[in-house]
Regions:
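Rhodanese-like catalytic fold shared by cysteine-dependent sulfurtransferases
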Residues: 2, 19-21, 28-59, 68-104
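Metallo-beta-lactamase
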Residues: 63-64
Length: 104
């Protein structure tokens, strides 16, 4: 299992307890400026790094700054067989959708 992913999953936030994985696909600098509490950070072009550690039927929400990169990452995951990959749009849209909070 990807070590970064395992560490975050171990810290079981409410969405993770429901079986939902939230991924912030922005740059490291954007991530450090604030991210959803339950999110893990994987830049969009590295999204397939989860393929060996996450079930293909897991509910996965992806977000970025505007929804563009998360859309690309969602397509990559869907093309790889992840049937429940969802583009949650921008960080604000994802925050509203998932009823989370933004932390720094």
């Amino acid at each position: 299992m990807h070590l970064k992913l395992a560490c975050f999953l171990f810290l079981a936030f409410p969405l993770i307890a429901q079986g939902i994985l939230v991924i912030d696909v922005r740059t490291t600098q954007e991530w450090q400026s604030g991210h959803l509490e339950e999110a893990i950070h994987i830049e969009w072009q590295d999204i397939l790094s989860i393929s060996e550690s996450v079930s293909k039927d897991k509910e996965i929400y992806l977000y970025c700054r505007s929804g563009n990169r998360s859309g690309k990452a969602t397509k990559i995951l869907i093309d790889a067989g992840f049937i429940n990959a969802i583009n949650a749009g921008s960080i604000q849209e994802a925050n509203n959708l998932l009823k989370s909070k933004i932390i720094k």
